[in-house]
């Protein structure tokens, strides 16, 4: 307390004194019943007219007011009371939104983290405090691995500092009570909704969305009726579902028509109750899965692959020399349980061995596999990885790309393709159509979706229903999108089954320890003046081509090359990419680089000691595997994309051969100060900060001015560069859309427009900037001139006279 407050206390102003004390009352010790050090005894001596009870009540109210003012809407002191031994418990739960705050420094943190990863989704995991969120889909995933509702509640209560809020208990019960009651089953390339409870199927068939999507056998031809699944118990079970009083009334009732598609199967060996089902259309699978999740009956997708005698087995096993790491084994344990495979998503950081996880899953299921990637280069890498880690024969692996259209000739095999090849809806060549008929005409045991975050895109999401597969596994390092479609993966693929902790893997040496830094580059006076005058697109070009940023890039390349590092420089802007690379004498790859030249540059970067730096556009975000790279410099990016930032960091995350103490990889993001680029940079870093990475801010690179042959050191050079930038048209500010999802393959996007709308000056209309003024649709102008109805009466008279 300040000296002034002490003097006021001596002057005998009890009300004022009580208010001052309330600001510094026992907030830190709130809830500790044994501590009497902050009892309001001194105030009683000051205010002799108040009783002890009255003073204590006023103190508590004032203290509560101080807490509410400090924490606002996050003040739960009235809702949550601390347990007596709360210091020994590691977490507490927000009663409003289901957030879980975990003390990562607690002795029980490791056990708590394993449990929380199973029942919730990680939101933020820095060094000392972790944040998780309980969602409906995370609880579905928890129940799918065998956890029971009461067990989830009991363990949470054991770990929580406070009693579990009733709202959270009710939410857990509501989300887990109906999970597993309805299954999506694939039989002979036909989809069925299956349940052991006929009343649940009645509920689904009454739904206005699901009901019309079933296949109604009454409208099928006699031939189609004969193909309906049947056995000895079908008729009796069907009667059990649809018959209310008698056979005659059931035939006339509308409920009989509604449930005529419900068919019972034979009793299973481990279940005494009959199983009931109805068939749905292939094209409606996505809609039904989404609707079932909305009405709290999520479809369970499990594959009893060991008892599948219809689909042939694939002869594949891991090689004896192949060893999987503990976190890879843990992720697979979430997928497999009770001899069955579940559909879902596994999230592992770049360089942590996602490919080996997928191959191990394929070796476990031992059925035909289709692997979908983002590019043709990834396709060849997956094929090579299958041959490296497993004992599969080369002729059992087929490749389906623009250049290769192979089929395996055995009963079972592996097909590796791209999302674009499968999702294409345009006219196909004869070979491509024949290959697609092969993919869609058979039943697949396992579909593996690499970089699964691209699936929610409108173009790619159709691949999930185009290919009929028993089990789906999605792999990604960055389960984030900027269009809020990432939640669609929960019903398109399945819930997130496992997400690794990046910092934990780095500490154990499974991935590199990366030092992240943001280098602030001041804008030169000339460039900043033009930046303030230009439009938004040209502004981007100005802050990317900032001479100070160029010098920082040159200095960092020189510094790390002398250390023996291999450096990747990323730029989404192709004009800047070419300008930087040509000025510094380095190789560069962008969307227009031929495939053969790309591979030659990458091989030189990997094996040639004289090639230590390459420049890449966004084509290298996800499609290259360069474990030799130890330093990454980013000079231009795709606005505020969090996913791209993490994917680029992943280019240097693979465990390094150099085991230096401390950091063994470096990530620099060059940002022009006082520009819009700083805003985008802060947005991009959000995902990595949530993973526990810290970004240092570097405002001055010591020794940069003394670098020999420093580019644009004189004002004349900077002015010349500025003139070159200003002479560029707006197209130079475009980002490289060059096949970032088809690195080395033909893009299936629309062909570029023959003309582009652009602003320009009079000199542009006169032929500058390689532009031309062309007037289209001249006949329409003539027609308007002839049309007299649109003219005023005075002008119509003049026009009539002229025509005569």
Curated annotation (Swiss-Prot):
Report which residue ranges the record marks as coiled coil. Answer: none
Q: Specify the Helicase ATP-binding domain's residue ranges.
A: 335-497
EC number(s) from the headed UniProt entry: 5.6.2.4
Give any single GO term for biological process.
transcription initiation at RNA polymerase II promoter
Location of the protein in the cell: Nucleus
Compositional bias, Acidic residues, is annotated for 14-36
Q: Which CDD domains does the annotation name?
A: DEXHc_XPB, SF2_C_XPB
Q: Which domain of life is it from?
A: Eukaryota
Write out the biased-composition intervals (Low complexity): 47-60, 220-229
**Family annotation (NCBIfam families):** rad25
Q: What does this protein do?
A: Probable ATP-dependent 3'-5' DNA helicase/translocase. Binds dsDNA rather than ssDNA, unzipping it in a translocase rather than classical helicase activity. Component of the general transcription and DNA repair factor IIH (TFIIH) core complex. When complexed to CDK-activating kinase (CAK), involved in RNA transcription by RNA polymerase II. Also involved in transcription-coupled nucleotide excision repair (NER) of damaged DNA. In NER, TFIIH acts by opening DNA around the lesion to allow the excision of the damaged oligonucleotide and its replacement by a new DNA fragment.
Q: What is this protein called?
A: General transcription and DNA repair factor IIH helicase/translocase subunit XPB
What species was this sequence derived from?
Schizosaccharomyces pombe (strain 972 / ATCC 24843)
Q: Give the gene that encodes this protein.
A: ptr8
């Amino acid at each position: 307390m300040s000296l002034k407050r002490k003097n006021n206390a001596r002057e005998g102003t009890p009300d004022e004194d009580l208010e001052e004390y309330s600001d510094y009352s026992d907030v830190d010790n709130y809830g500790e019943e044994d501590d009497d050090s902050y009892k309001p005894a001194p105030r009683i001596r000051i205010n002799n007219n108040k009783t002890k009870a009255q003073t204590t009540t006023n103190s508590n109210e004032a203290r509560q007011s101080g807490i509410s003012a400090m924490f606002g809407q996050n003040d739960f002191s009235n809702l949550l009371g601390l347990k007596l031994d709360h210091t020994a418990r590691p977490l507490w739960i927000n009663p409003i939104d289901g957030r879980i705050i975990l003390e990562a420094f607690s002795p029980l943190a490791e056990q708590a983290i394993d449990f929380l990863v199973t029942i919730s989704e990680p939101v933020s995991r820095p060094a000392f405090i972790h944040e998780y969120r309980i969602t409906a889909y995370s609880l579905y995933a928890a129940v799918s691995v065998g956890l029971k509702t009461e067990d989830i509640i009991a363990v949470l209560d054991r770990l929580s500092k406070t009693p579990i809020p009733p709202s959270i208990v009710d939410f857990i019960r509501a989300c887990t009570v109906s999970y597993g009651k309805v299954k999506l089953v694939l039989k002979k390339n036909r989809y069925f909704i299956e349940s052991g409870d006929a009343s649940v199927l009645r509920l689904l068939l009454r739904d206005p969305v699901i009901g019309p999507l079933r296949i109604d056998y009454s409208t099928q031809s006699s031939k189609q009726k004969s193909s309906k699944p049947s056995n000895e118990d079908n008729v009796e079970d069907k009667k059990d579902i649809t018959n209310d009083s008698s056979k005659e009334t059931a035939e006339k009732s509308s409920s009989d028509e509604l449930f005529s598609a419900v068919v019972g199967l034979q009793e299973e060996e481990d279940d005494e109750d009959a199983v009931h089902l109805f068939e749905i259309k292939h094209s409606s699978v996505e809609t039904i899965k989404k609707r079932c999740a909305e009405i709290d009956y999520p479809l369970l997708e499990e594959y009893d692959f060991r008892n599948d005698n219809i689909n042939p087995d694939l002869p594949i096993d891991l090689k004896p020399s192949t060893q999987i790491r503990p976190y890879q084994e843990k992720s697979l344990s979430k997928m497999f349980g009770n001899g069955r495979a579940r559909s879902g998503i596994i999230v592992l950081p770049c360089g942590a061995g996602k490919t080996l996880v997928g191959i191990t899953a394929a070796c476990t299921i031992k059925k035909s596999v289709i692997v979908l990637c983002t590019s043709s280069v990834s396709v060849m890498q997956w094929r090579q990885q299958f041959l490296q880690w497993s004992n599969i024969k080369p002729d059992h692996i087929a490749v389906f790309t623009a250049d290769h259209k192979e089929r395996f000739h055995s009963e079972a095999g592996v097909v590796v393709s791209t999302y674009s090849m499968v999702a294409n809806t345009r006219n196909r060549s004869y070979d491509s159509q024949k290959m697609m008929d092969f993919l869609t005409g058979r039943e697949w045991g396992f579909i593996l979706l690499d970089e699964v975050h691209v699936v929610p895109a409108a173009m790619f999401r159709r691949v999930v229903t185009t290919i009929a597969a028993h089990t789906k596994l999605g792999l990604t390092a960055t389960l984030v999108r900027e269009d809020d479609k990432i939640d669609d993966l929960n019903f398109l693929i399945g819930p997130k089954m496992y997400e690794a902790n990046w910092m934990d893997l780095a500490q154990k040496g499974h991935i590199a320890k990366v030092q992240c830094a943001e280098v602030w580059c001041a804008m030169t006076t000339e460039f900043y003046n033009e930046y303030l005058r230009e439009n938004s697109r040209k502004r981007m070009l100005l802050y990317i081509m900032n001479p100070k940023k160029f010098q920082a890039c040159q200095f960092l390349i020189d510094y790390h090359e002398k250390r023996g590092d291999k450096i990747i420089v990323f730029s989404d802007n192709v004009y800047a990419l070419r300008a930087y690379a040509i000025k510094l004498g380095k190789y560069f790859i962008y969307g227009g680089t031929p495939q053969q030249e790309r591979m030659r540059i990458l091989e030189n970067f990997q094996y040639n000691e004289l090639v230590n730096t390459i420049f890449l556009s966004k084509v290298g975000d996800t499609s290259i595997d360069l474990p030799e790279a130890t330093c990454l410099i980013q000079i231009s990016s795709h606005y505020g994309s969090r996913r791209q930032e993490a994917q680029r960091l992943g280019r240097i995350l693979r465990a390094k051969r150099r085991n230096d103490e401390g950091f063994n990889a470096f990530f620099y993001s060059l940002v022009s100060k006082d520009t819009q680029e700083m805003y985008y940079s802060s947005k991009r870093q959000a995902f990595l900060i949530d993973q526990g990475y810290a970004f240092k801010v570097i405002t001055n690179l010591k020794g940069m001015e003394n670098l020999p042959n420093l580019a644009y050191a004189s004002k004349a050079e900077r002015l010349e560069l500025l003139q070159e930038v200003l002479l560029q048209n707006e197209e130079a500010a475009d980002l490289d859309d060059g096949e970032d999802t088809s690195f080395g393959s033909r893009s299936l996007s629309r062909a570029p427009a023959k003309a582009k709308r652009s602003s320009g000056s009079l000199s542009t209309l006169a032929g500058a900037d390689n532009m031309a003024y062309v007037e289209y649709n001249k006949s329409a102008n003539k027609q308007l001139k002839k049309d007299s109805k649109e003219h005023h009466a005075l002008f119509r008279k003049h026009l009539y006279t002229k025509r005569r």
